[in-house]
Amino acid sequence: MLSAQLEAYLAEINLPATAEQKKQLIDFVGMLNKWNKAYNLTSVRDPEAMLIRHIMDSLVVSKHLQGERFIDVGTGPGLPGIPLAIMNPDKQFVLLDSLGKRIRFQKQVSFELGIHNISSVESRVEAYQPEQKFDGVLSRAFASIQDMLTWCHHLPAEHGQFYALKGQLNDEEMQHIPSGFAVKEVIELKVPKLDEQRHLLKIIKE
């Protein structure tokens, strides 16, 4: 059932996937559902809802990624990082979170599903100093764009971008982008079976 739904959703967003990638995405939902019962990793309890609200909500960003090295800040159980890593095996993803149970889950997913292009790091973002900066800084965890830019300003490479995943856009928030940053692009995203608004903001350092 989930496999057929995933097939339809991927076709709807025009994202090609191999049989192995589809299996990894479905198995990720299965592991998230299983671990969630014990570790409370997400408030979404139903696998079909997870497929929409976690997998597809992450994958609609995939075709907009530019570069090779990405960091997913406040990734939780690996969202959007793990689905994006599955669909972009040529890119590297660092998954950053401060809670050990989330990092343990991510590492188990990586091991069981054979995802070799992610590395999970347990750290607060302000304490994390990467040896190499990133082409893209992703997050759907921050309440405000201002918070994301304030906490993550040290992470992008010289020509790197911030990818802020937001729901409905707040005009006031857009007007209070911190100095030194500029919104390069606002992209409206359409997630299959989801009525709520979704936006991707690409932000650069000036």
Curated annotation (Swiss-Prot):
Residues the entry annotates as binding S-adenosyl-L-methionine: G74, L79, V125, E126, R140
CDD domains reported in the protein's UniProt record: AdoMet_MTases
High-level lineage: Bacteria, Pseudomonadati, Pseudomonadota, Gammaproteobacteria, Alteromonadales
Function of the protein: Specifically methylates the N7 position of guanine in position 527 of 16S rRNA.
UniProt keyword list: Cytoplasm, Methyltransferase, rRNA processing, S-adenosyl-L-methionine, Transferase
One cellular component (GO) term of this entry: cytosol
One Pfam family recorded for the sequence: GidB
EC number(s) recorded for this UniProt protein: 2.1.1.170
Protein name: Ribosomal RNA small subunit methyltransferase G
Encoding gene, per UniProt annotation: rsmG
Subcellular location per the Swiss-Prot or TrEMBL entry: Cytoplasm
Reactions it catalyzes: guanosine(527) in 16S rRNA + S-adenosyl-L-methionine = N(7)-methylguanosine(527) in 16S rRNA + S-adenosyl-L-homocysteine
NCBIfam families: rsmG_gidB (TIGR00138)
Keyword NAD: no
Molecular function terms from GO: rRNA (guanine-N7-)-methyltransferase activity
Family the entry assigns: Belongs to the methyltransferase superfamily. RNA methyltransferase RsmG family.
InterPro entries tied to this protein: rRNA_ssu_MeTfrase_G, SAM-dependent_MTases_sf
